[in-house]
Amino acid sequence: MPRIKTRRSKPAPDGFEKIKPTLTDFEIQLRDAQKDKSSKLAAKSNEQLWEIMQLHHQRSRYIYTLYYKRKAISKDLYDWLIKEKYADKLLIAKWRKTGYEKLCCLRCIQKNETNNGSTCICRVPRAQLEEEARKKGTQVSFHQCVHCGCRGCASTD
């Protein structure tokens, strides 16, 4: 969520009015996702967070695309958006590195989040999962990531 505006906050730089409606839509969607009633089942409680994480990802990707791909916003506006927490600075930094262009969330690359000390299964390319399943004679058992609900964010997918 963006920071709360106070008297000490700097005003938005030029160009913010052009992207404000889209950012407002994201904010409304995030509020709606937070208002949803949570389930008492452990599996269902994670799914509520998935929607919030996906909206957070989409908003950060929108700002990333505007600045790095389309070059539609100024550096001042980009820095202000990062400072006001409209986008995730660390996630955008990972997207700029090779191999992480489609990264869904930072939890999926943290090695201490898993039992065996490796990254999340959603980071494994789908072709590799299918090949290993074919060798074993089984179906691919991976459908969604437990952390964020991602269906696969390897850069080769």
UniProtKB/Swiss-Prot annotation:
One of its GO terms (cellular component) is spliceosomal complex. It comes from the Eukaryota. A motif (Nuclear localization signal) lies at residues 2-11. It holds the Pfam family BUD31. The keyword Nucleus applies. Keywords: mRNA processing, mRNA splicing, Nucleus. One of its GO terms (biological process) is mRNA splicing, via spliceosome. It is found in: Nucleus. Present with 1900 molecules/cell in log phase SD medium. Belongs to the CWC complex (or CEF1-associated complex), a spliceosome sub-complex reminiscent of a late-stage spliceosome composed of the U2, U5 and U6 snRNAs and at least BUD13, BUD31, BRR2, CDC40, CEF1, CLF1, CUS1, CWC2, CWC15, CWC21, CWC22, CWC23, CWC24, CWC25, CWC27, ECM2, HSH155, IST3, ISY1, LEA1, MSL1, NTC20, PRP8, PRP9, PRP11, PRP19, PRP21, PRP22, PRP45, PRP46, SLU7, SMB1, SMD1, SMD2, SMD3, SMX2, SMX3, SNT309, SNU114, SPP2, SYF1, SYF2, RSE1 and YJU2. Involved in pre-mRNA splicing. Important for bud site selection. Belongs to the BUD31 (G10) family. This is Pre-mRNA-splicing factor BUD31. It comes from Saccharomyces cerevisiae (strain ATCC 204508 / S288c).
